[in-house]
């Protein structure tokens, strides 16, 4: 008897999930970078100065808008804490445990974990200039990167891009590095884009300015991960990393057009319940068998809904 296939948590979509959230993500990235560009004390001083000017010019009534907004926000969160209002921070969260697996070309899933190889590409930048993200050269470099991501996403089936998740570092008080973890179908796709016209245009620009702009740092790391040598697990999580990717598929019941499949499947499948199973490692199984009862409790079938 054939082993049961992995159970997907969603159906194929007409467009990749990440493209549906592109506008909101862009806004969030800009907001995060701007907030990170100055220390908290600097932001408080800016706010205090502006409020002081407003009071001096228009009187103490100018304190009212700030008081109203703060009261609303505090009250809104208290209502969510007490359960009198839906917790909007849980929107999009997948409850229980799930894992990201590569679907077949028809959108179905087999029963073998990590059945395909992947390319993980880390790319980032940092500005070591007093202006931080407002430095003109750094802004130009950032604009090039944003445009390249849009180009990759616009024709992801050809470019081989599966998904990307942006991050901001926290090693410094301000102007931390910005990094994106990107996933590609194969190294050939990544290499082909690297030698394409737009990326080469960006490389040419970098070659022109790098000598005179030592304050702008860029880097990337590439990892080619063979099949059976990677694993993922998420609990009570919104899609992120590989789980936020989208794979081009052509379902048998479709009309021949490309659709996009989320890689997320129920982790309660016997082959997915532990890291040893997900990464196909007999070496690790001996360690995990000692604590099998503890692992099993984290997969309680009555724990919660598997999808939002």
Task: Please place each PLM-identified region on the residue numbering.
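Short S/T/G/P-rich N-terminal loop/turn motif that feeds into the first structured element of a domain
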Residues: 1-171, 215-308
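Sparse, context-dependent recognition of short Cys/His-centered cofactor- or disulfide-binding micro-motifs
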Residues: 106-108, 175-178, 205
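Residue-level signal for the start and early helices of compact helical domains
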Residues: 114-116, 175, 181, 211-214
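Short, well-ordered beta-strand segments in beta-rich or mixed alpha/beta enzyme
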Residues: 121-125, 168-196
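Short, well-structured alpha-helical interface segments that form or flank functional binding sites
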Residues: 136, 140-147, 175, 179, ...
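Short, surface-exposed, charge-dense and proline/glycine-enriched linear segments
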Residues: 185-202, 244-258
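An exposed acidic His-Trp-rich patch
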Residues: 188-217, 224
């Amino acid at each position: 008897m054939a082993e049961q296939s992995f159970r997907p948590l969603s159906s194929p979509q007409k467009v990749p999930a990440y493209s549906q959230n592109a506008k909101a993500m862009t806004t969030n990235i800009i907001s995060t970078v701007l907030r990170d560009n100055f220390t908290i004390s600097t932001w408080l001083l800016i706010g205090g100065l502006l409020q002081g000017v407003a009071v001096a010019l228009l009187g103490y009534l100018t304190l009212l808008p700030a008081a109203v907004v703060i009261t609303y926000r505090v009250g809104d969160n208290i209502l969510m804490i007490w359960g009198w209002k839906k917790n909007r921070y849980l929107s999009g969260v997948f409850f229980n445990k799930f894992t990201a697996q590569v679907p077949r070309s028809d959108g179905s899933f087999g029963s073998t974990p990590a059945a395909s190889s992947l390319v993980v590409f880390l790319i980032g930048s940092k500005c070591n200039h007093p202006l931080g993200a407002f430095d003109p050269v750094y802004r130009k470099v950032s604009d090039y990167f944003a445009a390249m991501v849009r180009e990759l996403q616009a024709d992801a089936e050809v470019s081989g891009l599966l998904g990307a998740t942006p991050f901001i570092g926290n090693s410094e008080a301000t102007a931390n590095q910005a990094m994106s973890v990107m996933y590609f179908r194969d190294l050939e796709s990544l290499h082909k884009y690297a030698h394409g016209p737009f990326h080469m245009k960006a490389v040419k620009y970098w070659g022109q300015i790098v000598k005179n702009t030592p304050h702008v740092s860029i880097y990337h790391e590439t990892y080619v991960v063979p099949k059976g040598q990677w694993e993922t697990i998420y609990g009570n999580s919104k899609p992120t990393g590989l789980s936020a990717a989208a794979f081009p598929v052509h379902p048998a019941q479709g009309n021949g057009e490309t659709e996009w499949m989320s890689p997320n499947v129920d982790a309660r499948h016997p082959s997915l319940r532990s890291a040893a199973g997900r990464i196909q490692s007999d070496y690790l199984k001996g360690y995990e068998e000692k604590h099998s009862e503890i692992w099993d409790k984290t997969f309680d079938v009555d724990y919660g809904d598997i999808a939002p």
